[in-house]
Amino acid sequence: MATCFLLRSFWAARPALPPPGRFRPEPAGTPRRSYASGPGGLHADLLRGDSFVGGRWLPAPATFPVYDPASGAKLGTVADCGVPEARAAVRAAYDAFNSWKGVSVKERSLLLRKWYDLMIQNKDDLAKIITAESGKPLKEAQGEILYSALFLEWFSEEARRIYGDIIYTSAKDKRGLVLKQPVGVAAIITPWNFPSAMITRKVGAALAAGCTVVVKPAEDTPYSALALAQLANQAGIPAGVYNVIPCSRNKAKEVGEVLCTDPLVSKISFTGSTATGKILLHHAANSVKRVSMELGGLAPFIVFDSANVDQAVAGAMASKFRNAGQTCVCSNRFLVQRGIHDSFVTKFAEAMKKSLRVGNGFEEGTTQGPLINEKAVEKVEKQVNDAVAKGATVVTGGKRHQSGGNFFEPTLLSNVTRDMLCITEETFGPLAPVIKFDKEEEAVAIANAAEVGLAGYFYSQDPAQIWRVAEQLEVGMVGVNEGLISSVECPFGGVKQSGLGREGSKYGIDEYLEVKYVCYGGL
């Protein structure tokens, strides 16, 4: 059953909600809120349609629609912020920074912890929002909310672990002091595939460091960012510290340019495509801003002859089909050694047929939701057709799902070659292409033959091989006999054109801190 968001106004007494699909008249001058009438219902306070700037819910001159990717139904409309709204949000964040940076680390820690507590208290509603606007299965959405909240918990603790240094210099009457100070206003630009976790992973670190933020969420999934704003406000995060400016696809370019060029912004943190990242880097270069970027991936998944096949198949399922293959670290290229190839392909196909169920994310038992939009479906379809035309074999799947719309069958291809689009381009969909290889050196060469290097996976029971391959793979993160590698305690990021900097872990907060050296003389 599809969930439907309806924008409406609330009277002080809050009358009973109308039936799904119907609107009540809106009293003039009241703030816009949203509600959803879906499985279990949703708490109305979490569903907002306005921007959140300077601690206030503000409309924009225009709105844009948000759609349920599973049904195509309109969920509601959200403020379509443009250049004036973006500049106002930056100014609000800048004004708030002057006081927020002076708040004690203990108080910042307590506020982040309170925000975490509120996320946990509202985890079910937050998960339903994710499923409604992104399409991912509710169970996965629930997992994302817990993962998302953990970043707030983690950085609430890291706020109290921002340490400096005292250095004894070569001069007897001098000492060097090293201080860490917040960089300033951070512009946070996030993707649709993890609409909550990608915000808290960045914002948690920024606020813990003493920075203020302006968040521009993806146009497909703005409700999650606005729900987080509501909870941040309830937690007591001061006005202007956390700002959200949703905008449509048509205005994304101009808003992004403002965030990258405004002199009041000191830091850019972006998760998205490599192509968009390059554009933002170009804009940020003119004012030499601090930049963190988590960009595209083309993750190799290597299975060596020594691997435990069942374990490798389980890892492949976890790595490839989470969020229907729409994750930046999901396996894009499967490289399987000749001696184990046929067994792996057979068991992988069996696991896919047995375990994967395509459907609406709210339906019990669904493991594969829709792709985010028609363009995403067309990309997967194009890659499958290209591979088949060049000689690949469809083992299972291979076409749009019978449900129609944005659904695509989980697909396994064999007899794949390196010249196929599914090997050279990131898929971001439920497509698993398998290449057969003979030698370790060959697999490593294929894996490293990419301009990007975010994550990589391999399965082996040979200790010497494990050390060699882990060191040789040109990626920022490696999964050894493991298909799920993300953890709040560990650094997340890539090499080559997969990005700059690291998020999460003890290293994540450093992305929002400047190191200042003070020479103390005359001692």
UniProtKB/Swiss-Prot annotation:
Function per UniProt: Catalyzes one step in the degradation of the inhibitory neurotransmitter gamma-aminobutyric acid (GABA).
Pathway membership, UniProt: Amino-acid degradation; 4-aminobutanoate degradation
Record-listed N6-acetyllysine modification sites: K74, K114, K128, K253, K347, K353, K399
Binding residues annotated for NAD(+), in chain numbering: R201, K216, P217, A218, E219, G272, S273, T274, A275, T276, G277
Annotated site, Transition state stabilizer, chain positions: N193
Gene Ontology biological process terms in this record: central nervous system development; gamma-aminobutyric acid catabolic process; gamma-aminobutyric acid metabolic process; glutamate metabolic process; post-embryonic development; succinate metabolic process; synaptic transmission, GABAergic
Organism field: Mus musculus
NCBIfam families: SSADH
A molecular-function term among this protein's GO annotations: identical protein binding
Domain of life: Eukaryota
Transit peptide extent on chain: 1-35
Protein name (record): Succinate-semialdehyde dehydrogenase, mitochondrial
SUPFAM superfamilies tied to this protein: ALDH-like (SSF53720)
Disulphide bond pairs: C328-C330
Active site: E294, C328
Lineage summary: Eukaryota, Metazoa, Chordata, Craniata, Vertebrata
Keyword terms: Acetylation, Disulfide bond, Mitochondrion, NAD, Oxidoreductase, Phosphoprotein, Transit peptide
GO cellular component: mitochondrion; synapse
Description of activity control: Redox-regulated. Inhibited under oxydizing conditions.
